[in-house]
């Protein structure tokens, strides 16, 4: 049975960090999340919750589909 999993467009965030010379800690502080949370979301270790999604969309001034996407995971295997 496929389950939707929200994923971040990691390449966008990493390129933003390079372009703006931001460390992960600096970006997390700007967004308003902990560095550990941002790291885990970017590495796919944690799904972003509503609060993190909202803060990131607000910070980047993007629509959901521009920063996140749905990945379908088969839970039956």
UniProtKB/Swiss-Prot annotation:
The keyword Secreted does not apply. It comes from Bacillus subtilis (strain 168). Residues 13-67 form the HTH cro/C1-type domain. GO terms for cellular component: cytoplasm. Residues 24-43 bind DNA. This is Uncharacterized HTH-type transcriptional regulator YvzC. SUPFAM superfamilies: lambda repressor-like DNA-binding domains. The keyword Cytoplasm applies. It is found in: Cytoplasm. One of its GO terms (molecular function) is DNA binding.
